[in-house]
Design a protein with these regions (language model features):
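Signal peptide processing junction and immediate N-terminal pro/mature segment
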Residues: 26-30
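A residue-level marker of the well-folded mature domains of exported/periplasmic proteins
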Residues: 31-312
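Short non-domain terminal segments
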Residues: 3-4, 17, 191
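N-terminal secretory signal peptides that target proteins for export/translocation
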Residues: 1-9
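Bacterial N-terminal signal peptides
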Residues: 11-25
C-alpha cells in the first residue's frame, strides 16, 4: 500500500506545481503576445512632451518585458496619423496610444473600424467604446514650482513662454503665480505666447524678450522646452522645465526644477487591461499623488529649506 502511495503523492504534487506555474506564467505569457503602437507628433528626443510619452512606453516595457512596441515619431495630425494607426493595426497592435491632442478624430475613426483594438488618447474630450482618454492635473505641480521660483528669483520677475492662451495653460500659470506669491509677495509673472506648440525661433525671441524685461526665472509650456531652457542658461537666468526631465541637461547651472509627466505606470495599467480583458472606456485624471507627475530633481541653486518646503 505504501509503495503505491508514494508515486501518487508525487504525481499530485507535480500536478499542483505545474498548475501553479501556469497561474504565475499566465499574465507574462499574455503580455508577450501584446503589441502596443504609439505615434508621436514630434521627436521622441525633444526633452518635453513627446519624450515624456516615449519614456512612459519604455517604463511599460520594463514592467512588462514581453510587450512588443511599434513606435513612430514626427507624425502629422490628420490623414497621416490615421494611416499610421491603420498600419499599426495591420501589424498586429491591440493597443494604440494616439499621443497628440490633434490625433483624437483620426483615432476615433480608426477605432470605429477596429472594435477589437483598444485606443488611448491624452487630453481627449470624446470617447468611444474602445477608446479611453486620460490626462494629468498639473496646477498643484505648477503651484509648487512657483514656490521654488518665488524663493529663487532675485529680481522678483518671473516669466513664462507659452504656446497658446487656452484655459488649461492659463490655469497652470495662475497656479504658478499663486505659489510664487505665497513665499514672495513681490513676485510677478509675465507671459509671452508664441501661437504654436513648436517653433524654436519664436520661443527664443519670446524668452529673450522676457529676459530683457528683467525676468530671471523662465518657465515654458510648449512641446519642447529645450530652446527656452538653453536661452535662459546662456543669459545666466534660472529655468523651470516641463513635460519631461530630459531638458535638465541643457541647463546645468540655471535649472531649478521641472514638472514631468510619468506615464509609465498608467501605460502599464493600460496594457494589463488589454491582456486581462478588463478594458473599459473611461476618462482618467490623476496628479502627483497618483504618480502621473513628478517634480524634477531640484537644481543646486535651490536652497535646502525650499526643497523641504515643497516636498513636505
Amino acid at each position: 500500500m505504501s509503495l503505491t502511495l508514494i508515486p501518487t503523492v508525487r504525481t499530485v504534487l507535480s500536478v499542483l506545481v505545474a498548475f501553479m506555474v501556469v497561474l504565475v506564467a499566465g499574465p507574462a505569457a499574455e503580455a508577450q503576445g501584446l503589441k502596443v503602437g504609439i505615434l508621436h507628433i514630434g521627436s521622441m528626443a525633444d526633452g518635453g512632451y513627446n519624450q515624456a510619452h516615449a519614456e512612459g512606453i519604455q517604463a511599460m516595457k520594463r514592467n512588462l518585458p514581453g510587450v512588443e512596441v511599434i513606435e513612430v515619431e514626427n507624425v502629422p495630425e490628420g490623414a497621416d496619423a490615421e494611416r499610421v494607426m491603420e498600419n499599426m493595426v495591420k501589424q498586429g497592435a491591440k493597443l494604440i496610444v494616439a499621443a497628440s491632442f490633434g490625433y483624437l478624430e483620426p483615432a476615433l475613426r480608426v477605432a470605429a473600424k477596429y472594435p477589437e483594438v483598444k485606443f488611448f488618447h491624452p487630453g481627449g474630450y470624446k470617447r468611444a467604446p474602445n477608446l479611453t482618454t486620460y490626462w494629468a492635473s498639473t496646477p498643484e505641480a505648477f503651484y509648487l514650482m512657483g514656490m521654488v521660483a518665488g524663493r529663487t528669483t532675485k529680481t522678483n520677475k518671473l516669466g513664462y513662454v507659452v504656446a497658446l492662451p487656452i484655459s488649461f495653460f492659463l490655469a497652470n500659470i495662475n497656479a504658478f503665480e499663486l505659489g510664487a506669491r505665497s513665499v514672495n509677495p513681490k513676485a510677478e509673472t509675465r507671459v509671452v505666447f508664441t501661437g504654436t506648440f513648436l517653433d524654436p525661433a519664436k520661443e527664443a525671441a519670446a524668452a529673450n524678450a522676457l529676459l530683457d524685461q528683467g525676468v530671471d526665472v523662465l518657465g515654458v509650456i510648449v512641446d519642447s522646452p529645450i530652446t527656452v531652457v538653453q536661452t535662459a542658461e546662456k543669459r545666466n537666468a534660472y529655468s523651470v522645465g516641463y513635460h519631461s526631465l530630459g531638458a535638465q541637461k541643457f541647463a546645468p547651472k540655471g535649472w531649478i526644477g521641472g514638472i514631468a509627466f510619468t506615464w509609465g505606470n498608467l501605460y502599464t495599467r493600460f496594457a494589463k487591461q488589454v491582456t486581462d480583458g478588463a478594458f473599459k472606456s473611461e476618462n482618467i485624471l490623476g496628479g502627483l499623488a497618483d504618480d502621473y507627475l513628478t517634480l524634477a530633481p531640484f537644481g543646486a541653486s535651490v536652497p535646502a529649506d525650499v526643497v523641504s518646503l515643497v516636498t513636505a
